[in-house]
């Protein structure tokens, strides 16, 4: 089966592009907008509309395979590719990628995914968002051409067992970190709430007191609202490097503070994502490793998650091999081709690192549903509920796609 025609269209993603460095520097609020000037190249304002490029591949049999090129909310930060704007990339796709897609055989996924992941135009690799969207569409094309589910294609090509069992799901609240928690508890989410602790003064506190109060409130709220004592969710909070800011990047002081949060969780497992941002990958690995070792020395049960500077497949390998943390976030759009997500999860699982198949609120329903199929095949420890910051909508998309797929897999046993 071959691709007859490739189409690229501009679209909106499910959230916004935010200049992370400007926010860390103290950008103010005006309603939903951030005030002040952007500092990351490519941004025209601190917050601007999220965009995507939809890929449609029309096959010889008339079936249409789809994928969405999307980039993370904090584009251009932490070693990532620059801001992804549709108007800049659609002409490029039509000129350079369309001729390579049309007439291409889609009977196998991996050769096509690897081709575009390694392709260089004018000496440069394709933007991660482009590789992400193309690979989604190519996986869908192979599934449609062969009458298989996308997760079956992944299992077959990696020689993995098809396991018709759910992956734990992680809900993200955005700034709605109180009301959204109630919603998550009502729907029994496995891991919550992300909480978006990306500002010292407003959210963390200059001594960490605001986060401490929030973790206590969070555990109290779960214990008081849950309908059954069997509901014992994991707490996972992303602090965007702010803990390092208030403790002068001292790994011992950072670890002592992180360990002190354990009692506030009242027996619920606690993960702290991105405790520091060292500004580059080698220093980030060293800092996280030092914090992890100190947490172990303290006998703490709190675990830390790598985020910043852990973007590509090779980054994930390096953070894992260093034993730098307890869990890595595999930020799906940052890896480019989705075959890298599979490889990253499998590497973590093989080497004793907990894998969190994450991503961004700034994706689309197409990319989120594709990620469900990838997760069901590769089996990470948890998967992010996405897209958007509304929570309910993302849960609807991800949870329902997972259950539909599991039901179909069960018919094939």
UniProtKB/Swiss-Prot annotation:
InterPro entries: Enolase-like_C_sf, Enolase-like_N, Me_Asp_am_lyase, MeAsp_NH4-lyase_C, MeAsp_NH4-lyase_N. Keywords: Lyase, Magnesium, Metal-binding. The keyword Nucleus does not apply. The record marks 194 as: Transition state stabilizer. Its cofactor is Mg(2+). GO terms for biological process: glutamate catabolic process via L-citramalate. Pfam families: MAAL_C (PF07476), MAAL_N (PF05034). One of its GO terms (molecular function) is metal ion binding. Its EC number is 4.3.1.2. Gene3D superfamilies: Enolase-like C-terminal domain, Enolase-like, N-terminal domain. (2S,3S)-3-methyl-L-aspartate binds at residues 172, 329, 360-361. The keyword Ion transport does not apply. It catalyses: (2S,3S)-3-methyl-L-aspartate = mesaconate + NH4(+). It is an enzyme of class 4 (lyase). Homodimer. Involved in the methylaspartate cycle. Catalyzes the formation of the alpha,beta-unsaturated bond by the reversible anti elimination of ammonia from L-threo-beta-methylaspartate (L-threo-(2S,3S)-3-methylaspartate) to give mesaconate. This is Methylaspartate ammonia-lyase. It comes from Citrobacter amalonaticus.
């Amino acid at each position: 089966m071959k691709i007859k025609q490739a189409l690229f269209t501009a679209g909106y993603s499910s959230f916004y592009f935010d200049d992370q460095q400007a926010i860390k520097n103290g950008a103010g609020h005006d309603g939903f907008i951030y005030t002040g000037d952007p500092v990351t190249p490519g941004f025209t304002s601190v917050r601007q509309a999220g965009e995507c490029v939809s890929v449609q591949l029309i096959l010889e049999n008339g079936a249409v395979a789809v994928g969405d090129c999307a980039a993370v909310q904090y584009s251009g930060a932490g070693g990532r590719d620059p801001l992804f704007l549709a108007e800049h990339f659609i002409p490029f796709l039509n000129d350079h990628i369309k001729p390579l897609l049309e007439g291409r055989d889609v009977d196998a996924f991996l050769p096509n995914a690897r081709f575009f992941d390694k392709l260089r135009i004018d000496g440069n690799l394709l933007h991660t968002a482009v590789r992400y969207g193309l690979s989604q569409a190519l996986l869908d094309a192979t599934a449609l051409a062969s009458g298989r589910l996308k997760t079956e294609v992944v299992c077959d090509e990696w020689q993995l067992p098809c396991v018709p069992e759910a992956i734990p799901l992680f809900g993200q609240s955005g700034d709605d970190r109180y009301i959204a928690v109630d919603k998550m508890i009502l729907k029994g989410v496995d891991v919550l709430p992300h909480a978006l602790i990306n500002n010292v003064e407003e959210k963390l506190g200059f001594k960490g007191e605001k986060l401490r109060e929030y973790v206590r409130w969070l555990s109290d709220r779960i214990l008081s609202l849950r309908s059954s004592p069997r509901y014992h969710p994991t707490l996972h909070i992303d602090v965007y490097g702010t803990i390092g800011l208030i403790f002068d990047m001292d790994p011992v002081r950072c670890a002592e503070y992180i360990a002190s949060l354990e009692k506030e969780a009242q027996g619920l497992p606690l993960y702290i994502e991105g405790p520091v941002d060292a500004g580059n990958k080698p220093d980030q690995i060293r800092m996280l490793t030092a914090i992890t070792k100190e947490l172990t020395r303290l006998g703490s049960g709190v675990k830390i998650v790598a985020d910043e500077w852990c973007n590509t497949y090779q980054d994930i390998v390096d953070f894992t091999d260093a034993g730098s943390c307890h869990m890595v976030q595999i930020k799906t759009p940052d890896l480019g081709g989705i075959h890298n997500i599979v490889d990253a999860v499998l590497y973590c699982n093989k080497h004793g690192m907990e894998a969190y198949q994450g991503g961004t609120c700034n994706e689309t329903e197409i990319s989120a549903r594709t990620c469900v199929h990838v997760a069901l095949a590769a089996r990470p420890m948890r998967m992010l509920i996405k897209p958007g910051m509304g929570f309910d909508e993302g849960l609807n998309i991800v949870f329902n796609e997972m259950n539909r797929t599991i039901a179909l897999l069960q018919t094939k046993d």
